[in-house]
Amino acid sequence: VGLILSSAQNPLMNEFCVEQNIPFEVLNHMESDAYLNVCQKHEINWVILAGFLKKIPEAFIEAFPNRIINIHPALLPRFGGKGMYGKHVHEAVSKSTVHFSGITVHLVNEEFDKGMILAQYAFSLKNRSSTEAIESHVRILEMKYFPRVIESVIQAEIIE
């Protein structure tokens, strides 16, 4: 990990980064030049998003073609797009007629949640149909699988 970049102050993350000797920077506005400059300064090759809710500017995407990975807390493409994050996604899943939910790890492109899907992990909604139960199980899957997918994609360089 060459850099952790946040859109908000985060004392716990800052403390973790100091302990791990990882640079930590806060940029609270999405200006592609500022993000590009910080990534270039730290010689970043891959960008991993987690909990990043803003649209990524095209100039930033162009600077990291097929090298921006995001996680989505539902199975795409059905529960994706602008406004589909956090509890909004879990509420939509809970109110739907689907029998499964899960997570999607995907590349980022110019459209919300439309990049190439790298991996999906699903679970049955049987006995887990409340928003809270869905959210809880999604978090378990995120913690278990997101690091594994990132590692395998970066090590294998499967994206060309």
Residue ranges and their predicted role:
Residues 1-160:
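One-carbon transfer enzymes
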